[in-house]
Structures are given as C-alpha cells and as structure tokens.
Amino acid sequence: QPRISTTVWEALALSNTMIGLATTRRYTWQSIGALGVIELTAPNRVKQVSIGLKRLGISREMRAYFDLHAALDVSHSRAWVREIIRPLVDADPACAAHIAEGALIRLVCGERCFDRYSAELQCQVATC
C-alpha cells in the first residue's frame, strides 16, 4: 500500500502540482495544459514501456495493453488538440500562453520524477 512517508518527493510534488492546478480556478488554463500534455506524451511513453517489457522477455499477450495504447493514444492526443486546445485558443488567443505554461510545468515535474525513478532503480540494480 503506498504511503506518503515512502513516496519520493518528486512524485508528491507532481501530484500536488496537478491537484493545485485543477482545484484553483485562477489556474484553469494551466490545468488544461498540464492535462493536455499528458495526452500528447502518452503514445511515446506507453510505446517505451512496451519496448522495455519486450526487452525483459515479457510475452506479447502481457504487453498487449501497452501496444494497444501506443496506437490508440495517438488518436486521443490528436482529438485533445482538435476538440479542446484549438477551440479554446481560437476563442481566446490569450489563453495559449497559460496553457503552454501548464504543459511545461507538468513536463518539468514529470522529468524530475523520471530522473528520480531512474536513479532509484539504478541503485537497486547495482546492489543486486
């Protein structure tokens, strides 16, 4: 069971950032950008997970979810831009900078998480 006391601070910061953006009206545009960038980066992320699982010898059946989402999430990301981002920016071009800011905030938080996870996992592998 996950506990705050055993969760790396970078993951807590990411979670708190997403919650903070989503629960504060003044950060509506940033929240949309942060959520949108998750959709936009999902296809490559799940593709990389599938490649890693394959490298570890995990069967095609066990990788099916990730293989499916690597393809499906491409259409989701296009739909996110077409149906959410583009109409908002067309209606109010000033929101574009705030949406981009939210996307960058989420990307930086995610990068810090992945860097920490990588460092933690390397330490665990090195001590095996």
Predicted features, each with a name:
Residues 1-128:
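Non-heme di-metal
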